Amino acid sequence: IAACRAGGERVLALADEYGVETLETISAHNMNLSEQALKARISELPSGVSSTHEWVEYDGRGTPELYELFAEMRAENGTLNFRFSGREQVPCFINGAQGGIEGNTISPILVMLAYDIPFNEGIWRCINIDRGEPGTIVNPVNPAPVSNAHMETGAKIARMVSTLISDACSASDSSLLRSRAAGQASSASTGTAWFGTNREGNLSVFFPMDLAVAIGGPAQTVADGQDVYGYQSTLSIGFPDI
């Protein structure tokens, strides 16, 4: 909330300084530049369709379950077209809401293909997402619970997208894109809730993020995979080094 407020104030300050028309013109130009840059990079991927699948693991109701889901990627004309499908939605919080699916689709694209391209609407213009038939774990409908969409089904979407992009990069004629191929990010964590009495004598609860991001990353062509890594959807998360 604080970041959104600060960002809004700075945009208003820019509008006051340069005028709304100038700001909109430059913003549109920047979006077009990002779109052109990503389209050019996608065009260096081999045309065609690739597919993969994953499972969402969940045992919150006492019985270990595996919920299968699928992904298909078509690269053509500078555009990445994704189609997802999965089993019918379930009465637990793993169902993938729209934000969880779309956010976890674009995160691997940002770190693997658009790592040096400014992120704005122009990036989204190069990506089409089809979540398939309503009523599944990738396209749930009310009253499906979705409070952990980003870390459950969403995280598996990120794993599938990174696999598809790595496969496409490996088959590219571009040495730059071939160097972007990488192993899987963990996209998993051991979630824990810590609680106790704080120094004021009140109950305190917190969720440490170390187990979500302080994990060895995947092997890459330019690194050995021993960096601090975790969910691909947490691109800039920080935690205290204590």
Question: Where in the sequence are the language-model features?
Answer:
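Glycine/proline-enriched, intrinsically flexible loops and inter-domain linkers
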Residues: I1-I242
